[in-house]
């Protein structure tokens, strides 16, 4: 059973893209708030 499970790879890919999306939203929120408060 050395064959990797494709289902697990899909889950890890979705989790990574979710983290990138959250990071992008966080950066945009910080830039937007600094633009507003200046």
Swiss-Prot record:
Q: How does it sit in the membrane?
A: Single-pass membrane protein
> What is the similarity comment for this entry?
Belongs to the PsbL family.
TM stretches of this protein: 17-37
GO annotation, cellular component aspect: chloroplast thylakoid membrane; photosystem II reaction center
Name the job this protein performs.
Answer: One of the components of the core complex of photosystem II (PSII). PSII is a light-driven water:plastoquinone oxidoreductase that uses light energy to abstract electrons from H(2)O, generating O(2) and a proton gradient subsequently used for ATP formation. It consists of a core antenna complex that captures photons, and an electron transfer chain that converts photonic excitation into a charge separation. This subunit is found at the monomer-monomer interface and is required for correct PSII assembly and/or dimerization.
In terms of superkingdom, the source organism counts as Eukaryota
This chain belongs to the protein called: Photosystem II reaction center protein L
Tell where it localizes. Plastid, Chloroplast thylakoid membrane
Name its GO BP terms in alphabetical order: photosynthesis
Q: Membrane among the record's keywords?
A: yes
Q: Which organism is it from?
A: Chlamydomonas reinhardtii (Chlamydomonas smithii)
The cross-references to NCBIfam families, in alphabetical order and at most eight, read: PRK00753.1 (NF001972)
